[in-house]
A protein has these predicted regions:
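Acidic/His-rich, divalent-metal-binding segments that scaffold phosphate/diphosphate chemistry
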Residues: 1-112, 116
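C-terminal end-of-chain micro-motif
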Residues: 1, 199-200
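Divalent metal-dependent catalytic cores for phosphoryl transfer on phosphate-bearing substrates
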Residues: 47-49, 55, 67, 79-198
């Protein structure tokens, strides 16, 4: 269970303190008017709970900050020039594609007494079939410009789970090689998903 209001307040604080780019205010207003803060992160795989999407985004942010802080202790760190704005954008907004993506449906399940009852569950209601990471890039770009590094990080954050990779596309290897920050955001996403979140 997550505290939706506490997570929303923390998300807004991080966003407003770090993201100052032109158009970011309009994007934040759109987010606040959307289901972002109450949506699940998935229908069944991780954080499939009320407020799971915002919680996941914060977890990815925290993991990325921790990874970059550790990497930057090294003299030859690849991340010394990554701004706090880029970290916030690439992690807090990486799953923007999930806004208005899930809906609650009902199914019949036997309870502990053997009686059938209707229980809610999340289903996918795809309104903009534009992919996953690339859809998030597209949606963000409707409000503000992304740097190439941010776009790559958001676009490829799914890593090997990305449908393009599953289909045989090898672009991800080139992207991770050319844009180390994209690799780091993917690792932060995996850590958040498998180490920090509800998977029931």
């Amino acid at each position: 269970m997550v505290d939706v209001e506490l997570n929303k307040a923390r998300f807004l604080q991080i966003y407003e303190e770090n993201i100052k780019r032109e158009g970011s205010d309009k994007l934040l207003k759109w987010l606040c008017d959307s289901d972002f803060f109450v949506a699940p992160a998935s229908s069944k795989f991780h954080n499939a709970i009320l407020g799971g999407l915002c919680d996941h985004s914060l977890n990815v942010y925290d993991r990325a900050v921790e990874l970059i802080e550790n990497e930057n202790k090294k003299e030859n760190s690849l991340f010394k020039n990554v701004s706090t704005e880029s970290i916030a954008i690439s992690t807090l907004l990486h799953d923007l594609c999930k806004v208005y993506y899930y809906k609650v449906s009902l199914r019949n399940v036997k309870n502990e007494f053997g009686t059938w009852e209707q229980v809610p569950y999340y289903t996918v209601d795809e309104k903009l079939p534009y992919g996953h990471g690339e859809k998030s890039v597209y949606m963000i770009s409707g409000f503000m410009r992304l740097t190439r590094e941010e776009a790559m990080a958001i676009n490829w954050h799914m890593g090997g789970f990305d449908k393009r990779v599953v289909g045989g596309d090898f672009s991800i290897s080139k992207a991770f090689s050319q844009f180390p920050f994209a690799t780091l955001v993917h690792i932060a996403d995996i850590m958040a998903t498998y180490f920090d979140e509800d998977r029931d």
